[in-house]
């Protein structure tokens, strides 16, 4: 079916699906009221079309008046349907039709109009009318998998009942009510989709895209048989009875046979591609695998990986299934794959890569595998023989009726295994057996319903059963207590119980496809008894006389037990077994230590247990289906001889238990709280520290959600942390923990630091919780201290700024007037002493002004408020300008300033003004503390490690280490040694503000450089400033 949108996507919309299920005529139009986007069968019929395809994507020619009426109601911005009466058709045939018009949103968000009306014929067949062709098949399926209505060729697809049940379950679990995947039809799989239309009662729309098998197409084109087909056959059979049996065999031999598979042991390794969906279902596999292991063995598309692994026997530790759940890349996983038609299995290595959509939606895995036929090994379970379609060719059929009856149970179990490997394959033509295998509605072709014919056959079965038991006592049973066919049967039973309990089995109304075989005269089959009919004595005569314990049951419901079972278990009657608990009370599959047993254990009425071997058959019982379970006690000869290994295992187990106890003790001793969480987010257990931390008893918190341990404002953060780890995202790699607020049992709150890790085997989590109350208290104290220090610093800066403003104004007046008076511009000063006083006033004023400026600069640096403009600065040029400014003062002091600048010195990243100020401060101190005749040497260099270094060396008086420490403190001056004075008898070290070196060091560090000073008394001082490579603009 054509169209811009898949038919089933629109049929599953909430505004469409219920009307579709009722059989309403529905039409989805674009807003131009001409383009038909979607229509169902009744809707196409309403406008005169027989098929949906004839109208979808076409132009609908509505009358102008009808368009106007629909457009008037569709302009309302509401999704509620509006009723409108219009006339459809033309001339005398026009009819008044009541339509319901509503606005809907298509799957891609495009707005459209839904036009619908009720139709007289609301049957299921009418709902899907106009749909389906040679390559498209439509069906309506109810809640139990029954096909309510279908397109003509749907039955030819041969979809099994179990497949329909799986599709119904998946559609019910889907959030958008649609499941799209490949669906198994007969021996192949084709693309299809199923949508859940209604919930009460449940009704599903199933769409399949694919041609029916060729052998069924011919049958579909043939004329159906009339109702009196049986009478016609009775007339034809005598006429053909004279033909010899060789003619029938010749006819069968002349039919074309499918090409058989032959395993090539010497073939080179083959590489194949495979894909699975988000649920682990195989969606694609390349034919390279089938070329090595056989087509039946590689026909796994549409099946879950866990199911295939369970049937093929390579589900050992579940590691691959766990990797499929983790959604991460993996490789190097090895398993053994059975080879069709052989007793071999070949090693296969698998690797996979997760696939995501653009919206990071997980789409499944895409991987490759390598199969190595040259390394094939023997398969103890011989699964490959079952995949080949039955008994190997070198086995001769047994013609004796008794032998055939004895092997029926095993053949039936084999048929169950074959159904898993090759679902619904046509059965081979076999001679008529002494047991009548009658088809029953609700069962697939591979299920066998056995009805016993006569007392003679019953006696033969009993004799052969007794003979079989004697031979079994002498034979050595395989490992695990079960034969390969029995083990395959149990796998199939587990598969079916997983999908749907046998207690809820039902009879389906569809008639199974008959097997292809030559026509032979048959004896009339006794009618099947209904449940209401009383049990006939001959129906249970064989079972009652058997010496083997037998149970007839369906799921947990027990229908019949024989006397041998009552004798071995110690129960008086069947009612006693039912009242004690039924099937569950009879069997125990776990040992005392909780480990799963390899064989079944029968529990007696007194509580004692006995190992038994089991044999399972599918039989007809009271007109329905049931399972017959026969038990064979395991004798002492069958049990393995005691060895020294169990003793060693006991010692190892005791050591392991002691180690576990030690670990528990360590966890309880730890001061941090440890909480174990299951995959659903519930608390499994906690140690003593966690119990004391939150005030909960261990058993009180177990089973409750992990979020109960946190305050409301931290619950979301804690659960997001947990979900982030389960999704294999960034948190699973960068797990840095979380700070949360815990909630005590009494309502108090605790600050906690939480770290969660994943547990590898249980898929759970482990949370470690640490009480950080003391950390928070210390952090709060440090925060308060920092705030107090910042407040004091701001107060000091504010005070200095205010004092500076108050001092600058009178200082400027004093300095200005003193300079004016010293210049005698308004008249001479009669006395030279007054001139000296004026010079002292001017010098003192400038000194105080420099002090105020230095105070402001150092306060700004300490507060981080100094305005600095970082740019490329030429260090040589900055120092050269400072030398030029200090040269007059050095000449007056008779101090020589020498410079040594490295050529091609790279620029540095610094504040130009502060670099000049640093150079001036260092040169000023060097000139001031150097005696006349001394030298000051300024140099720059570019080191090999990328550093740029500035050095200022003088030959002055120098300082000791204690004096250097004192000089680097603000407002501290060196008041020391007498005798080191200038020629004017004035101690130059008592001059200054005491801020020169501290301010210089602060400016250097503000420019991200390093400040160092080295001085010795009487030898001079060296100041070194290093700019690291990160502050150097090298070429």
Swiss-Prot record:
GO terms for molecular function: ATP binding; histidine phosphotransfer kinase activity; phosphorelay sensor kinase activity. It is found in: Cytoplasm. It comes from the Bacteria. The modification Phosphohistidine is found at residue 805. SMART domains: HATPase_c, HisKA, PAS. SUPFAM superfamilies: ATPase domain of HSP90 chaperone/DNA topoisomerase II/histidine kinase, Homodimeric domain of signal transducing histidine kinase, PYP-like sensor domain (PAS domain). It is an enzyme of class 2 (transferase). It catalyses: ATP + protein L-histidine = ADP + protein N-phospho-L-histidine. PROSITE patterns: HIS_KIN, PAS. Residues 659-730 form the PAS domain. Residues 802-1031 form the Histidine kinase domain. One of its GO terms (biological process) is regulation of DNA-templated transcription. The keyword S-adenosyl-L-methionine does not apply. Residues 614-1035 are annotated as: Interaction with DivK. InterPro entries: HATPase_C_sf, His_kinase_dom, HisK_dim/P_dom, HisK_dim/P_sf, PAS, PAS-like_dom_sf, PAS_fold, PdhS_histid_kinase. Residues 500-533 are annotated as: Disordered. The keyword Glycoprotein does not apply. Its EC number is 2.7.13.3. Residues 1-613 are annotated as: Important for polar localization. Keywords: ATP-binding, Cell cycle, Cell division, Cytoplasm, Kinase, Nucleotide-binding, Phosphoprotein, Transferase. One of its GO terms (cellular component) is cytoplasm. Functions as a polar differentiation marker. Essential protein that, by localizing in the old pole of dividing cells, controls cell division and maturation, probably through control of DivK phosphorylation status and cellular distribution, which in turn regulates CtrA, a transcriptional regulator of the minB operon. The asymmetrical localization of this protein is probably required for cells to enter a new division cycle. Interacts with DivK. This is Cell-division control histidine kinase PdhS. It comes from Brucella suis (strain ATCC 23445 / NCTC 10510).
């Amino acid at each position: 079916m054509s169209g811009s949108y898949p038919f089933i996507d629109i049929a599953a919309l909430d505004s469409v699906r219920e009307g579709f299920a009722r059989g309403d005529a529905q039409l989805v139009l674009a807003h131009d009221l001409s383009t038909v986007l979607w229509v169902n069968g009744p809707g196409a019929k309403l406008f005169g079309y027989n098929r949906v395809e004839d109208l979808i994507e076409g132009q609908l020619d509505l009358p102008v008046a009808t368009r106007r009426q629909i457009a008037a109601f569709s302009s309302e911005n509401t999704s509620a349907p509006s009723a409108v009466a219009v006339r459809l058709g033309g001339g005398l045939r026009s009819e008044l039709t009541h339509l319901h018009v509503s606005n809907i949103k298509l799957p891609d968000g495009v707005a459209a109009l839904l036009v619908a009306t009720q139709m007289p014929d609301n049957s299921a067949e009418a709902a899907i009318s106009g749909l389906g062709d040679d390559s498209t098949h439509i069906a309506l399926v109810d809640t139990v998998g029954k096909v309510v209505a279908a397109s003509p060729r749907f039955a030819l697809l041969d979809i099994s009942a179990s497949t329909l049940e799986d599709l119904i379950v998946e559609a019910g679990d889907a959030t958008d009510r649609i499941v799209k995947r490949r669906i198994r039809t007969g021996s192949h799989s084709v693309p299809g989709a199923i949508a859940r239309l209604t919930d009460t009662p449940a009704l599903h729309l199933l769409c399949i895209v694919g041609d029916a098998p060729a052998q069924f197409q011919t049958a579909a084109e043939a004329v159906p048989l009339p109702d009196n087909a049986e009478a016609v056959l009775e007339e034809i059979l005598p006429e053909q009875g004279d033909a010899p049996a060789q003619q029938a065999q010749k006819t069968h031999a002349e039919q074309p046979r499918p090409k058989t598979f032959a395993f090539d042991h010497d073939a080179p390794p083959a590489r194949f591609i495979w894909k699975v969906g988000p649920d682990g279902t195989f969606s694609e596999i390349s034919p390279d695998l089938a070329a090595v292991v056989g087509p039946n063995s590689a026909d796994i598309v549409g099946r879950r990986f866990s199911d295939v692994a369970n049937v093929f026997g390579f589900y050992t530790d579940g590691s691959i299934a766990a990797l499929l759940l983790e959604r991460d890349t993996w490789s190097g996983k090895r398993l053994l794959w059975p080879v069709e038609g052989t007793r071999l299995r070949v090693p296969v290595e698998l690797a996979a890569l997760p696939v995501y959509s653009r919206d990071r939606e997980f789409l499944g895995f895409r991987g490759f595998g390598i199969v190595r036929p040259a390394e094939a090994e023997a398969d103890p379970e011989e699964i490959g023989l079952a995949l080949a379609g039955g008994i190997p060719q070198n086995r001769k059929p047994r013609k004796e009726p008794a032998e055939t009856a004895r092997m029926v149970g095993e053949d039936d179990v084999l048929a169950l295994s074959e159904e898993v490997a090759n679902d619904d394959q046509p059965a081979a033509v076999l001679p008529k057996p002494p047991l009548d295998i009658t088809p029953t509605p609700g069962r697939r072709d591979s299920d066998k319903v056995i009805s016993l014919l006569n007392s003679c056959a019953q006696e033969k079965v009993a004799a052969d059963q007794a003979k079989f038991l004697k031979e079994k006592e002498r034979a050595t049973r395989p490992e695990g207590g079960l034969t390969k066919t029995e083990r395959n049967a149990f796998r199939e039973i587990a598969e079916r119980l997983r999908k749907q309990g046998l207690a809820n089995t039902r009879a389906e109304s569809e008639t199974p496809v008959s097997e292809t075989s030559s026509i032979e005269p048959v004896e009339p089959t006794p009618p099947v008894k209904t449940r209401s009919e009383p049990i006939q004595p001959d129906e249970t005569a064989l079972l009652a006389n058997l010496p083997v314990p037998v149970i007839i049951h369906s799921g947990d419901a027990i229908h019949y037990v024989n006397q041998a079972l009552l004798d071995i278990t110690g129960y008086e009657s069947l009612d006693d077994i039912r009242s004690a608990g039924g099937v569950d009370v009879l069997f125990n599959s776990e040992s005392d230590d909780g480990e799963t047993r390899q064989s079944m254990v029968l529990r007696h009425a007194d509580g004692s247990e006995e190992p038994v071997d089991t044999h399972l058959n599918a039989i007809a019982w009271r007109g329905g289906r049931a399972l017959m379970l026969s038990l064979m006690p395991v004798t002492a000869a069958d049990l393995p001889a005691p060895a020294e290994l169990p003793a060693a295992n006991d010692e190892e187990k005791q050591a392991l238990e002691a180690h576990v106890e030690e670990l528990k003790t360590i966890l309880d001793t730890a001061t941090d709280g440890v909480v174990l969480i299951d995959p659903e987010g519930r608390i499994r257990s906690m140690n003593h520290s966690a119990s004391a931390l939150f005030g909960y008893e261990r058993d009180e918190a177990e089973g409750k959600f992990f979020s109960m341990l946190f305050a409301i404002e931290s619950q979301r953060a804690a659960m997001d942390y947990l979900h982030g780890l389960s999704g294999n995202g960034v948190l699973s790699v960068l797990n840095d923990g979380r700070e949360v607020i815990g909630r005590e049992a009494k309502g108090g709150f605790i600050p906690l630091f939480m770290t969660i890790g994943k547990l590898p085997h249980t898929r759970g989590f482990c949370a470690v919780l640490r009480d950080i109350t003391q950390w928070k208290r210390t952090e709060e104290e440090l925060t308060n201290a920092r705030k107090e220090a910042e407040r004091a610093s701001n107060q000091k800066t504010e005070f200095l700024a205010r004092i500076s403003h108050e001092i600058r104004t009178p200082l400027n007046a004093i300095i200005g007037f003193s300079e004016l008076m010293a210049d005698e511009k308004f008249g001479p000063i009669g006395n030279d002493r007054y001139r000296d006083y004026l010079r002292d006033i001017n010098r003192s004023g400038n000194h105080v002004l420099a002090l105020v400026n230095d105070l402001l600069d150092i306060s700004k640096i300490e507060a981080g408020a100094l305005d600095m403009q970082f740019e490329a600065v030429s260090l040589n040029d900055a120092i050269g300008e400072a030398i030029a400014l200090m040269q007059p003062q050095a000449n007056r002091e008779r101090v020589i300033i020498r410079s040594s600048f490295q050529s091609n010195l790279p620029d540095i990243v610094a504040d130009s003004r502060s670099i000049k100020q640093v150079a001036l401060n260092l040169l000023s101190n060097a000139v001031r503390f150097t005696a006349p005749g001394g030298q000051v040497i300024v140099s720059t260099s570019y080191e090999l490690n990328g550093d740029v270094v500035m050095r200022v060396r003088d030959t002055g008086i120098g300082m000791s280490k204690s004096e250097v420490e004192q000089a680097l403190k603000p407002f501290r001056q060196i008041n020391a040694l007498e005798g080191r004075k200038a020629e004017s008898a004035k101690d130059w070290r008592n001059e200054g503000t005491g801020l020169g070196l501290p301010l210089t060091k602060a400016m250097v560090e503000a420019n991200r450089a390093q400040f160092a000073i080295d001085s010795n008394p009487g030898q001079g001082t060296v100041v070194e400033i290093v700019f690291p490579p990160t502050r150097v603009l090298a070429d």
